[in-house]
Amino acid sequence: AGFAGDDAPRAVFPSIVGRPRHAGVMVGMGQKDAYVGDEAQSKRGILTLKYPIEHGIVNNWDDMEKIWHHTFYNELRVAPEERPVLLTEAPLNPKANREKMTQIMFETFNAPAMYVAIQAVLSLYASGRTTGIVLDSGDGVSHTVPIYEGYALPHAILRLDLAGADLTEYMVKILTERGYSFTTTAEKEIVRDMKEKLAYLALDFEQELETTTTGSAVEKNYELPDGQVITIGAERFRCPEVLYQPSLIGMEAAGIHETTYNSIMKCDVDIRKDLYGNIVLSGGSTMFPGIADRMSKEIQALAPSSMKIKVVAPPERKYSVWIGGSILASLSTFQQ
């Protein structure tokens, strides 16, 4: 969350609401009935955590309201009734959801005006384009969204329920095979950090595996919060490989490359060339080093041989949805 015209968000926190498991034991401690974001994360030992956004879609409006309240009053410290609000939604978000979102903004927060934009479209704006296909992959869901002249093409949008959370789960699994156990939510956070700091995508998975068995060039050390140091090797590229081979976690789905290709093939034949030449990556789960080269290679194998393919991975892609929103909301045409 942040303000239009800024080049980075003012507040970044997980969409989590935590409620105390037990009624207040310590009287007068001023225990809140709910904690949001980082505070919920840090007090998770005494809380029951809930995630109101599942696979990119809001499914718990009371908790979502808590998150918005926290955003306005604690993070941004603005009165929502004084400023127009731009919210984002997942592609293919049900109409009822958008209506509910609008209702809460106007009735609960008294916003003077609001607009709901599709996340992937904002990412494309942030990259300075109005035509292209965006692969947006976050924690709960991935989407491929073809956009032509600023408009998303709903019939060609594809959703893949495979994203960051699944990669973290898989990392936990393959580390368990090595004898390291991570079970609690706190420990899973450690694995997520390990994934974000050390994982990368191999250009050629099989070849990378062979190289790893002979040498130790891939091995890296990671220090756990208690000071213990663990060494991870092939796990570094085995983990994000799931994006290209969902079968590794037993999912019968097309990988992100194939989903992108399928999405392009659902579009009019005349615009495919523009889409192949503008494949834009967005979201935290596209932050792995090597992802753009690998994507390029995989799409080239699927596309017609003469096709010019360009995969764009902007350095700020973790927040490009937000940045696109900041750009859009500061346009004078938008404010009217």
From Swiss-Prot:
EC number(s) given by UniProt: 3.6.4.-
Entry GO MF terms: ATP binding; hydrolase activity
EC primary class: hydrolase
One of the GO biological process terms: cell division
Localization in the cell: Cytoplasm, Cytoskeleton
Gene Ontology cellular component terms for the protein in this record: actin cytoskeleton; cytosol
Keywords: ATP-binding, Cytoplasm, Cytoskeleton, Hydrolase, Nucleotide-binding
InterPro entries to which the protein is assigned, alphabetical: Actin, Actin/actin-like_CS, Actin_CS, ATPase_NBD
Pfam families attached to this UniProt entry: Actin (PF00022)
Family: Belongs to the actin family.
Additional note from the record: There are at least 13 actin genes in potato.
Its biological purpose: Actins are highly conserved proteins that are involved in various types of cell motility and are ubiquitously expressed in all eukaryotic cells. Essential component of cell cytoskeleton; plays an important role in cytoplasmic streaming, cell shape determination, cell division, organelle movement and extension growth.
Protein name, entry field: Actin-46
